[in-house]
Regions:
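Positively charged n-region of N-terminal signal peptides that target proteins for export
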Residues: 1-4
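Bacterial N-terminal signal peptides
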Residues: 6-16
Length: 261
């Protein structure tokens, strides 16, 4: 009887494990995620910290994210699968990012979002700690036309956090603050950028950083007087950019993967 129960328990565990395991993600998607990590490093959006994820193409409630490591060193072997709650499906002893809940909770709250970038973009951080709003100063940052809300972690986690989104509850609060915006600033921390594709998320993350630099320069040069894109200009430029951003992606990816060899 004991032997039978042991066999039965083993069978149940095997079935449960098989049920949790998703079909293998498209290798091309994994390659693009590796490229995204390296592009963001090459473009100065991330350094040793920061991360980017993409929805699983065959199991949409799951997502792909590298193990806890510097983005500029990520390879295909480092990509892991996570469930909707941020649990690693098959960790194999690998360390995971403390802030994976940024990704899990945004995907959970916003089914239309297919990719998430979290960074500590240096030029962006000042806009999260001052009253100056991040607004589009040129056509490639037109997606900022609707504004970028600022997430205040004290409102969700009190005044004694380490500023990290290390719990599902904090991740959910960030997802609510993001709303339908493509970018949310995180006071004293960085920002999160989202998009309906991995390529567009990378494009937006790069040009969020570029816009922040240009806006700061324009404000100084113009002594606070800057002509920003209006709503109509921003909407039209965003539509145009969606059709041509692959040009930047192809260039960035080729360079990023070439340096990886």
């Amino acid at each position: 009887m004991r032997k039978f129960l042991g066999m039965l328990l083993g069978l149940v565990m095997t079935v449960a494990s098989a049920a949790a395991q998703s079909p293998t993600a498209d290798p091309a998607l994994i390659e693009d995620l590796v490229a995204a990590n390296r592009i963001l490093y090459d473009q100065g959006v991330v350094d040793g910290f920061g991360h980017v994820s993409v929805r699983h193409d065959k199991t949409p409630e799951h997502f792909l994210l590298a193990r806890s490591m510097a983005p500029g060193l990520v390879t295909a072997a480092d990509i892991m699968e996570f469930d909707r709650d941020g649990n690693a499906i098959d960790p194999k002893g690998r360390a995971v990012y403390l802030e994976r809940f940024i990704h899990s909770e945004i995907y959970k709250a916003h089914p239309e979002i297919k990719a998430v970038v979290h960074s500590h973009s240096p030029a962006v951080i000042p806009f999260g700690v001052t009253s100056v709003k991040l607004r589009p100063v040129f056509h490639l940052s037109s997606f900022l036309g609707g504004g970028a809300p600022v997430f205040e972690i004290r409102e969700a986690g009190g005044s004694a956090t380490d500023m990290l989104i290390r719990t599902p509850e904090l991740g959910a609060a960030l997802a609510r603050s993001l709303g339908t915006a493509p970018v949310a600033l995180m006071r004293g921390h960085g920002d999160v950028v989202v998009a309906p594709s991995l390529q567009e998320a990378v494009f937006r993350a790069v040009y969020t950083e570029v816009n922040a630099r240009l806006e700061a320069e324009a404000l100084q040069l113009g002594q606070g007087q800057v002509v920003f894109l209006n709503d109509e200009e921003a909407a039209k430029a965003t539509a145009t950019n969606a059709g041509v951003l692959v040009r930047a992606w192809d260039l960035w990816k080729a360079r990023a993967l070439a340096t990886a060899r």
